[in-house]
Amino acid sequence: MKYDIIIIGGGLSGLTAGITLAQAGRRVCIVSAGQSSLHFHSGSFDLLGYDVEGKPVTRPLEAIGQLGAEHPYAKIGFERIARLADEAETLLNEAGVKVKGDSKKNHYRFSPLGRRIPAWLTTDGYTVCEEADTLPWKRVEILNVQGFLDFPTEFISAGLKKQGAVCQVKSFTTDELRHARKSPTEMRATNIAKVLADRESLRKVADCINAVSGEADVLLLPAVLGFSDEKNLDELKTMVEKPIAYLPTLPPSVSGVRTAILLKRLFARLGGTLLVGDKANGGVFKDGRLVSVTTDHLPDEALYADQFILASGSFMSHGLESNYQRVFEPVFDLDVDAAGKRAEWTKEDAFDAQPYMEYGVRTDRDFHAIKDGQTVGNLFAVGSVLSGHNPVRLLDGTGVSLLTALQVARTITERR
């Protein structure tokens, strides 16, 4: 099979690149091995949350200019970041992932443990604050589904009380939710979202909430609605008498699953091909270019393309792997930026910046991958497979995924 572009990896960066290229009229195929790290998504997208010293960033576009030369943002070019950030927001909203935010100034989202964390874009309806030290309400009621353990209400309440809010924790249930509770494996956020997918179930939830809620400025609920779109989140707001807002839960993330579904739908509408549950396992190189790739489920048929994008993720997604001797990229054995000695991969203190978090595929300034010291002219790397940054310490992971994908897609479309 022959395509214009083949993308290896169906996560945030792979889908972003695929959508952008399909919109430009390219014939695109995405090879996706399985579920991506979007299933751990917070409901927010991060451009740059903390600087290199660990201090919260208020104005990310200004702080990005202080990052090192090997950071993916530096390779993009600091002068392009604002434009690409706007394009990323437009793409998400076009896919149906309704977000709000501003690349010029971070707002603050809530973690599932009640901490406030800098964020660039946040899903509509999720609880945010414009400032780090003020809350938009005084009296808060935190409402949880009975038996749902992935929404630690006591931690959230303690965090809000420290910031001056008067908090009450309450719970509710319905017959449908009570039935789901019989099996602990069914009390995950994504399973609850499926149980509450129809209007009748949603009406029962609203009636329960109206019955137990008191005199609060806002009702904070776990984000367990809207598995495939945001309709139920908005609909519940019209049914409940008090203002409500949603807080993220522990994984799996309903918002992340919904984001993946909506991006895949847009990619399919644009005519893209998605090979789901297949894994790229190698490629043929000739004269400094990648000619074709092979996959586990198509052992007798190579996939050919003019351009290739590696968006396979980091260690969690098996885009990077390691053994006792080395860190390596498993599909093409590309050059990797990593320490040679295993003892240097980690620090003894778990709270220190861990060196392995900055490991990734080595690229040139245009994100061409490098193999055996030589640039591969038609193979690009994007997203969390890239080296040069620590997404946990800098809180820039989703921003790097979105913006590097957009930049590489632009580079490819400008070649013709």
Where are these regions (language model features)?
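Conserved beta-strand-loop-beta-strand element in the redox core of flavoprotein oxidoreductases
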Residues: K264, G282-A302, F308
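Short hydrophobic core segments
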Residues: I6-I8, V31, A280, L303-G313
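N-terminal Rossmann-like FAD-binding beta1-loop-alpha1 element of flavoenzymes
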Residues: Y3-I30, A409
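Dinucleotide-binding Rossmann-like beta1-alpha1 core, especially the glycine-rich loop
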Residues: L47-E131, R139-I142, I156-L160
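Helical element adjacent to the flavin cofactor pocket in flavoenzyme catalytic cores
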Residues: F151-Q163, V195-V218, L225-G283, P299
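FAD-binding beta-loop-beta segment adjacent to the flavin cofactor pocket
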Residues: P299-D300, V336-K341, W345-P391
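A conserved FAD-binding loop/helix module that cradles the flavin
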Residues: H318-Q325, G377, V385-R416
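Conserved N-terminal glycine-rich FAD pyrophosphate-binding loop of Rossmann-like flavoproteins
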Residues: A33-A69, E176-I192, G399
